[in-house]
């Protein structure tokens, strides 16, 4: 009997200035699936002296960490492994000593990449894992360097690596561990001076969306969610968190809801750099990217991943993995878009992400049926909220889960969500339910001709009376749906012509 060939494993290791990271994935069905993530706080940059020589203690911390990584690498083909060093290993005068022993421990070569190459790889990781239309600004605050990239699609248009990071700024501007206004102001001002040479180029290029791809940004998002805020980072929120940090006199006393002990040490320095970036570049809002350097390394190795719309690739891979009827998903999505257009399109739901989320839900709403029909909506919600979905933010995944939970039968009001406004979120759900109901025979040729009109939240669905008379099940389901929506304050009437 033939034995199935397992999917190939790939490993990417990033010897960062603050942490060493290892990512192990497998390539399956045109996408990558994360198999392991290992992270150790090495704080290599903190071991640099005034002559940029690494201390023996810092090097030993790094070697000890790599001994752990080496065990996992034994099972992965050499050609599927990429190991890179970044800012601290670019700077250290005795980097050769560290790398020679590290190579022996790992059994694989370490490539110390330039700042520009690091920025390009970060952008590749973001482009393959984060959605969003138009030009994007990517910010990655590392331990000893900060990368800023402007790009569109898979092409980077501006690449910059600046010699400032959360570890080096900690040692330079918070050396006394005091969280004073003076220390914060000095750290922010110094970061702005580093940014000055690139401001003209970056503001002239411009961008449509801004994403952050670092531990600093991830920590900020975790804090904001823990404190009941949405996931979008703004300057106002950063300033609020700075005030919270300054309530502690000393760094070791820092206690902010949602901030883990592991991230606390470099939080004020990373926050200072991010405030400077927001103020210098007049950034309105930032969200967390789906990937960065390690993901970029993986996507460089996996050659046959198509450079296509990230969300389209995600949907296709999920449909394949969970055996979802993609033709029916396309039918529901097409009908949902048609109903939206009949209601006035963007004039009725004036949010650019709304139709994308509507179509995604339409294509994936049956994912839970692979587990069980009876609680299909519940299973669909759980899967969409917990799967890795490149191209979708955490808030969008949460919202998708809540609307597919309610795609049929019983209807309840949506809980608080941050992907869309309350009004838009509700309207998208109403369209999804109608599209699923009207396409229940699973063939576009058998769909009724309908006209949906909207006066604010009052919907009127008009169908051919003769068709309804011949299709009593659909008629009954539409009457029930009208009652369900109307009962929770969403008026829906069914009319015949």
UniProtKB/Swiss-Prot annotation:
It catalyses: guanosine 3'-diphosphate 5'-triphosphate + H2O = guanosine 3',5'-bis(diphosphate) + phosphate + H(+). Keywords: Hydrolase. Its EC number is 3.6.1.40. GO terms for biological process: guanosine pentaphosphate catabolic process; guanosine tetraphosphate biosynthetic process; nucleobase-containing small molecule interconversion. Pathway: Purine metabolism; ppGpp biosynthesis; ppGpp from GTP: step 2/2. The keyword Nuclease does not apply. GO terms for molecular function: guanosine-5'-triphosphate,3'-diphosphate diphosphatase activity. It comes from the Bacteria. It is an enzyme of class 3 (hydrolase). The keyword Hydrolase applies. Catalyzes the conversion of pppGpp to ppGpp. Guanosine pentaphosphate (pppGpp) is a cytoplasmic signaling molecule which together with ppGpp controls the 'stringent response', an adaptive process that allows bacteria to respond to amino acid starvation, resulting in the coordinated regulation of numerous cellular activities. Belongs to the GppA/Ppx family. GppA subfamily. NCBIfam families: PRK11031.1 (NF008260). This is Guanosine-5'-triphosphate,3'-diphosphate pyrophosphatase. It comes from Vibrio cholerae serotype O1 (strain ATCC 39315 / El Tor Inaba N16961). The gene is gppA.
């Amino acid at each position: 009997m033939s034995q199935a060939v397992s999917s190939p494993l790939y490993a990417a290791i990033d010897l960062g200035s603050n942490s060493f990271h290892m990512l192990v994935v497998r390539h399956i069905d045109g996408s990558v699936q994360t198999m392991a993530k290992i992270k150790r706080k090495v704080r290599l940059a903190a071991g640099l002296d005034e002559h940029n020589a690494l201390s023996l203690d810092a090097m030993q911390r790094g070697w000890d960490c790599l001994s752990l990584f080496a065990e996992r690498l034994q099972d992965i083909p050499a050609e599927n492994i990429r190991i890179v060093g970044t800012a601290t290993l670019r700077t250290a005068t005795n980097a050769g000593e560290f790398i020679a022993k590290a190579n022996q421990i790992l059994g694989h070569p370490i490539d110390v990449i330039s700042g520009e190459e690091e920025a390009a790889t970060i952008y590749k990781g973001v482009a393959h894992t984060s959605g969003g239309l138009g030009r994007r600004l990517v910010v990655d605050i590392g331990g000893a360097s900060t990368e800023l990239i402007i790009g569109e699609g898979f092409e980077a248009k501006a690449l910059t690596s600046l010699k400032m990071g959360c570890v080096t700024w900690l040692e330079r501007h918070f050396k006394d561990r005091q969280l004073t206004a003076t220390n914060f102001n000095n750290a922010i001002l110094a970061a702005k001076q580093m940014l000055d040479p690139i401001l003209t180029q970056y503001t002239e290029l411009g961008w449509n969306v801004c994403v952050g791809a670092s531990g600093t940004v991830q920590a900020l998002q975790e804090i904001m969610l823990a404190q009941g805020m949405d996931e979008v980072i703004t300057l106002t929120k950063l300033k609020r968190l700075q005030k919270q940090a300054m309530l502690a006199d000393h760094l070791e006393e820092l206690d902010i809801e949602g901030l883990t002990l592991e991230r606390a040490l470099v939080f004020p320095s990373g926050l200072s750099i991010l405030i400077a970036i927001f103020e210098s570049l007049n950034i309105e809002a930032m969200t967390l990217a789906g990937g960065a350097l390690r993901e970029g390394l993986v996507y460089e190795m996996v050659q046959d991943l198509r450079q296509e719309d990230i969300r389209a690739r995600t949907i296709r891979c999920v449909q394949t993995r969970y055996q979802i009827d993609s033709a029916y998903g396309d039918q529901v999505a097409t009908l949902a878009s048609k109903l939206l257009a009949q209601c006035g399109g963007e004039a009725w739901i004036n949010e650019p992400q709304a139709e994308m989320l509507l179509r995604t839900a339409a294509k994936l709403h049956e994912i839970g049926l692979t587990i069980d029909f009876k609680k299909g909506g519940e299973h669909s919600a759980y899967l969409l909220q917990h799967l890795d979905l490149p191209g979708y933010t955490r808030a969008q995944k949460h919202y998708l889960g809540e609307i597919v939970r309610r795609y049929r039968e019983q209807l309840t009001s949506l809980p608080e969500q941050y992907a869309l406004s309350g009004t838009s979120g509700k309207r998208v759900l109403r369209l999804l339910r109608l599209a699923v109901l009207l396409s229940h025979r699973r063939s576009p040729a058998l769909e009724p001709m309908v006209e949906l009109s909207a006066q604010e939240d009052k919907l009127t669905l008009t169908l051919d009376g003769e068709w309804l008379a011949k299709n009593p099940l659909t008629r009954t389901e539409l009457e029930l749906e009208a009652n369900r929506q109307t009962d929770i304050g969403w008026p829906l009437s069914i009319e015949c012509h």
